[in-house]
Design a protein with these regions (language model features):
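Internal catalytic or translocation cores that form aromatic/hydrophobic pockets or channels
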Residues: 65-69, 73, 77-93
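Alpha-helical structural elements of signaling/regulatory helical domains
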Residues: 7, 33-36, 54-57, 71, ...
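All-alpha amphipathic helical-bundle segments outside canonical DNA-binding/catalytic cores
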Residues: 39, 78-82, 99-115
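Alpha-helical structural segments
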Residues: 10-33, 39, 43-50, 61, ...
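C-terminal peripheral helix-coil segments that are non-catalytic and often amphipathic
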Residues: 47-54, 84-100, 115-161
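Short hydrophobic/aromatic patch on the recognition helix
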Residues: 1-5
């Protein structure tokens, strides 16, 4: 490990870069600029939902990184740079939605990203405790589809408010 990465900390930074790189690279392939604003938001929400649902290890590692106050993310310019792509894409969607009268003015793309990520991330990061406490199977197909639709609806209602 030390031969290739120098330290276990650097290995961890590279794992984070790989995981964040995977989501950011795939987001850039969604062709959001080619879609109408409402459809683009649907695609972002559905992609984020499915990505988190299918990449539980990503969610776990992000949770662990937050326990450590983001110390390893701070070591990576790559993660920050690649993460700007989704913010620019959301900024473009918001601008087009405002211009067409579909979305209200004044929504910040980082706030929108936080909202989408929060809804999609929480149901995975807390799935065991939430499922047990409220006796719901968050991993059932019926519940997943219901939650995906609910999140799309909530985000779009926020944008149209």
């Amino acid at each position: 490990i030390y031969y290739y990465f120098g330290s276990k900390e650097q290995l961890y930074v590279e794992v984070l870069e790989k995981l964040y790189g995977d989501i950011r690279n795939t987001e850039s392939e969604l062709n959001l600029g080619e879609l109408e604003p409402v459809e683009a938001i649907h695609r972002v929400v559905e992609f984020t939902f499915d990505h988190h649902d299918n990449n539980v290890d990503f969610v776990r590692i992000v949770c662990i990184e937050n326990i450590h106050n983001g110390e390893n993310v701070k070591q990576s310019d790559t993660i920050q740079a690649k993460s700007q792509n989704i913010i620019r894409a959301l900024e473009d969607i918001l601008r087009r939605g405002e211009e067409s009268g579909e979305f209200r003015a004044g929504v910040h793309p980082i706030d929108l990203h936080l909202m989408i990520s929060s809804f999609c991330f929480y149901r995975i990061s807390n799935r065991h405790t939430f499922s047990e406490i409220f006796q719901i199977e968050l991993w059932s197909d019926e519940v997943k589809q219901r939650h995906k639709a609910m999140i799309c609806d909530a985000v779009l209602r926020y944008l149209k408010a």
